[in-house]
Design a protein with these regions (language model features):
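Conserved strand-to-helix beginnings and helix N-cap segments that scaffold or border functional pockets
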Residues: 14-19, 73-75, 151
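Anionic-ligand anchoring segments at beta-strand to alpha-helix junctions in alpha/beta enzyme folds, i.e.
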Residues: 2-59
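Active-site cofactor/cluster-binding pocket
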Residues: 45-101
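A structured phosphate/pyrophosphate-recognition subdomain
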Residues: 1-9, 20-27, 96-168
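A short, conserved beta-to-alpha structural element at the edge of catalytic cores
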Residues: 37-38, 93, 120-121
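Short, glycine- and charge-enriched coil/turn segments that flank and shape catalytic ligand pockets
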Residues: 29-31, 76-77, 82, 121-125
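General beta-strand structural signal in soluble alpha/beta enzymes
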Residues: 4, 34-36, 88-89, 126-128
């Protein structure tokens, strides 16, 4: 039972990562859901995140693109689960280290850039839907690849997502 936490006022990186990780874990037959303190903006509805409704007791809590506990928010029962985070997957160099384990790459332009590598390491195929979710994270956190945080690796990952069937 795995619960994926996103940050409040969700952007494309946190919800894209949450949805992509959800799909990857479902491919491994895991019981999984996503929780966000705030509603998912309509522009990200295509991610089809399976939102947590209390249907299981989480054994593992994973945060994606959340640099500190203050970013979780307090709605939808978030505080109950954000008190103990097992793993944080993040790209913010200033990550506070609140999780038991933190997978951090401060040179990544988006958490999606890092999560792409994680999903590959899990042995899960990058489906067109996972590619759409991860590409959304890349595109939104880089200002459509205009921000200075955009690197050659960001473009390499974007190209691999397009090859996997991302709908650009």
């Amino acid at each position: 039972n795995i619960l994926i936490l996103c940050h409040k006022n969700p952007d494309g990186d946190t919800i894209g990562c949450g949805s992509a990780l959800y799909c990857a874990l479902k491919a491994l037959d895991k019981n999984v859901a996503v929780l966000c303190s705030d509603a998912i903006p309509n522009r990200y509805a295509f991610t089809n995140a399976h939102m947590f409704k209390g249907e299981f007791e989480p054994q593992t809590v994973v945060a994606v693109d959340v640099a500190s506990v203050q970013l979780f928010g307090e709605n939808n029962g978030m505080t109950q689960f954000s008190r103990h985070v097992d793993l944080c997957i993040d790209h913010h160099a200033g990550n506070s280290g609140y999780a038991d384990f933190t997978l951090l790459n401060g040179s990544a332009a988006a958490a999606a850039e890092l999560l792409y590598e994680v999903i590959n390491a899990m042995g899960v195929a990058i489906t067109p839907h996972i590619a759409d979710c991860l590409y959304t994270g890349l595109a939104t956190d880089t200002g459509c690849f205009r921000f200075s945080s955009t690197t050659a690796n960001t473009h390499i990952v974007a190209a691999k997502l397009i090859e996997a069937g991302c709908h650009v």
